[in-house]
Amino acid sequence: MLRITGGKVYDPANNINGVVKDICIADGRIVADVEGGRILNATGMVVFPGGVDIHTHVAGAALNFARGMTPENQRRAVPILHKGERRAGIGGPTPTTYATGYLYAGMGWTTVVEAAVPVLTAKHTHEELRDTPIVDKACCLLMANNELVLDLLEAEEIERAKQVVSWLIRAAKVYGVKAVNPGGVTAWKWGKDAKNLAEPIEGYSKTTPAKIISSLAQIVDELRLPHPLHIHCNNLGAPGNVVTTIETMKILEGRRAHMAHLQFHAYGGDDWHNLRSEAATLADYFNSQLNLTADAGAILFGDAVTITADGPWQHLLYQLTGRKWGNLDVENETGCGIVPYTYRPNNLVNAVQWAVGLELLLLINDPWRIFLTTDHPNGACFWRYPEIINLLTSAEFRRERLKRLPAKALERMTLMDLDREYTLSEIAIIISAGPARALGLTRKGHLGIGADADVTIYHDNPDAYQMFKVPRYLIKAGEIVVEEGDIRHMPEGREFLVQPPCDEKIEEYLRPIFQQVYTMSFDNYPVEMDRIAKPEIQNCK
């Protein structure tokens, strides 16, 4: 049992905004009161629900591929040494599994979502997640280029496609469905892309990106998954792609959806020489679409590693930069591309990208619908989130940083005109309460009775960067695991998954297809439940 007393509590899900009150914990949950137990004096401190990262890339074959491609990053990274319970690890843009858990927890985050998992490599992903300590986890399954599903959409068999998607979710032991460049990764196997949402993709006569998007959104809603379709739009990173992004949002009208790393989809112009921010245009449209949530995918200057299933984009990035390039096909399901990248403040495109992420966070007026991410490790490392929080809470600090950018870049953005400053309550929403709600994780992101006892306690510091960089305490499931940045305990986190209803007869349809087109047998394909660390099945309702 534990009582936290004297701290200013920010619990926006329960309309608590800086109120000094006690938080009581027993058996890993928030309770109304406790008798006895430890008392934690949080006077002069700020109490938040534990952070929730709705979109990150921290485990699986793609991360291992990236680690192998960038040994120079591992050499430069600060090592995490073995100490007591703590295992050794390496940080940097693609931290090792143990380091990932320590770095998230050391910053005050307690739940993370691995946003891109193919079924074929899901066993690898789950085993790495099992090695990622402290934080709770969930996964999104890559689906918008899975040829088992696309073939059924081509044949207008939407009901059977739904059963296949449901079976694949159950087989992969995941929480949600992810659509990456719908149709574009399939087209990449032919050396092409899917830039026009209305044109059939390569290898099909009727299946378009628009059809894939609308069908998957329908399937996710009909399966009643707690998290809506999680979508990475077509034409990521391209000048003028704001048109595609808004077209995608129009296709999704009437359906739930989460728009991933929106910064990479908010550009105007028609080539790299005149690329400009269209964050204001996109935010204005997004504000009217109450069916949508989004995460920012903000960038920060410095080294990154771009990792995505969006193979055609990665090839273009390789051509633009001349950096190392890795490309993989994941059989009939998806692909993978890796390119190391450095964002530079004196680069006009990078300067605009930096501004766009902040502009979206400031111009989208409802913090319950836009969340803090960097699409780790694509835009910046997740452990740099406090830098972004500092930029959001201080207009003066933003203006100081803007002075370091090229004058031509300033003409292509609106950030200098934005005076909005986030409050602590709004920060609590975009890093915890909002993403938890969008994920449908009802015990996360708040400090109400019955919530998981995931609590972060910060020093109340006017310097937001220093405040959020190192919490005073992190409490995970009722146990103090981090104190002043030091890992005290290393509990194993849970993994959330869903098991939507599925017609068992769908296996009769799938088994012969596997024998014909897969290198893995049908019986070896599903992930066994005993590979999952502390699985917790969430209801589909």
Predicted stretch roles:
Residues 70-90, 192-203, 313-339, 394-412:
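A solvent-exposed, charged loop/short amphipathic helix patch at secondary-structure junctions
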Residues 50-61, 228-236:
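Histidine-centered catalytic micro-motifs
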Residues 48-55, 113-115, 260-261, 295-296, ...:
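Active-site neighborhood of phospho(di)ester-bond hydrolases with catalytic His/Asp-centered motifs
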Residues 1-21, 25-26, 60, 73-111, ...:
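Active-site microenvironment of metallo-dependent hydrolases
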Residues 157-181, 185-370:
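Histidine/acidic residue-rich metal-binding segments in metalloenzymes
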Residues 34-49:
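Active-site metal-binding motif and surrounding structural segment of the metallo-beta-lactamase
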Residues 59, 120-122, 145-149, 184-188, ...:
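Flexible loop/turn segments at secondary-structure boundaries
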Residues 54-201, 535:
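Divalent-metal coordination cores built from histidine and acidic residues
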